[in-house]
Amino acid sequence: MSDQQLDCALDLMRRLPPQQIEKNLSDLIDLVPSLCEDLLSSVDQPLKIARDKVVGKDYLLCDYNRDGDSYRSPWSNKYDPPLEDGAMPSARLRKLEVEANNAFDQYRDLYFEGGVSSVYLWDLDHGFAGVILIKKAGDGSKKIKGCWDSIHVVEVQEKSSGRTAHYKLTSTVMLWLQTNKSGSGTMNLGGSLTRQMEKDETVSDCSPHIANIGRLVEDMENKIRSTLNEIYFGKTKDIVNGLRSVQTFADKSKQEALKNDLVEALKRKQQC
């Protein structure tokens, strides 16, 4: 029964507005306390922003940079609140983490023109793993609010030759928009999308891990953006257009009659 309850709960969370995930998740846990651990580990939540007081830069909070009640900043590598024995990446991986944060900071600035990004890496037996986080919230200008949260978890298995690596990327994007205009009223639109991909890439000075991961993330975000734009927003536009027409009924009737006349004329021409 618990498996069925979990499936139903996850299916419900996928259909509810992303901007209300925390409240809805809390309500579900109150209803079925036994699902608490499974839900918290399975449901991606909107990213929260913290300030690194050491370097004066913002960073994003998630389970991957948390140890107990403290969170590690990717900029200073310090925990807040301070934690003496908190989990840390190896020296080699920390160097890669610093480079990755600088690279994705530029990526975020180019693609999103603002927002906050963070990259966290940790060691594995045969390689390493990491998470790339990006958050861009609308400022509410032009009566439009919204937020984009993307979470990219990548696992890197380094081959024994050291010249190639296997990359496994799992990406989740949570997006919501809200418009409030006097002519059309308030409209909410939001959802989340998760996609996976795996790929083998060459590792060299010309194509290091950061460049390979960057290309994978860029390609995945472009695909997700395209899917959201063409399928979700496109479908919503079709539905709205079907419900509400800018044409008068008389104009629409004339257009339909003209279309029927053209069809009949083409049929007669083909018969001749």
UniProtKB/Swiss-Prot annotation:
Positions of modified residues (Phosphoserine): 2
Residues bearing the modification N6-acetyllysine: 235
UniProt-recorded Gene Ontology molecular function terms: actin binding; cadherin binding
Keyword NADP assigned: no
Pfam families xref list: F_actin_cap_B
Keywords, alphabetical: Acetylation, Actin capping, Actin-binding, Cytoplasm, Cytoskeleton, Phosphoprotein
InterPro entries noted in UniProt: CapZ_alpha/beta (IPR037282), CapZ_alpha/beta_2 (IPR042276), CAPZB (IPR001698), CAPZB_N (IPR043175), F-actin_capping_bsu_CS (IPR019771)
Main location: cytoplasm
GO biological process, one term: lamellipodium assembly
SUPFAM superfamilies in the cross-refs: Subunits of heterodimeric actin filament capping protein Capz
Subcellular location: Cytoplasm, Cytoskeleton; Cytoplasm, Myofibril, Sarcomere
Modified residues (N-acetylserine): 2
GO cellular component terms, semicolon-separated: actin cytoskeleton; brush border; cortical cytoskeleton; cytoskeleton; cytosol; extracellular exosome; F-actin capping protein complex; hippocampal mossy fiber to CA3 synapse
Subunit description: Component of the F-actin capping complex, composed of a heterodimer of an alpha and a beta subunit. Subunit of dynactin, a multiprotein complex part of a tripartite complex with dynein and a adapter, such as BICDL1, BICD2 or HOOK3. The dynactin complex is built around ACTR1A/ACTB filament and consists of an actin-related filament composed of a shoulder domain, a pointed end and a barbed end. Its length is defined by its flexible shoulder domain. The soulder is composed of 2 DCTN1 subunits, 4 DCTN2 and 2 DCTN3.
Job of this protein: F-actin-capping proteins bind in a Ca(2+)-independent manner to the fast growing ends of actin filaments (barbed end) thereby blocking the exchange of subunits at these ends. Unlike other capping proteins (such as gelsolin and severin), these proteins do not sever actin filaments. Plays a role in the regulation of cell morphology and cytoskeletal organization. Forms, with CAPZB, the barbed end of the fast growing ends of actin filaments in the dynactin complex and stabilizes dynactin structure.
Family: Belongs to the F-actin-capping protein beta subunit family.
Stated name of the protein: F-actin-capping protein subunit beta
Taxonomic source organism: Homo sapiens
Gene, per the UniProt record: CAPZB
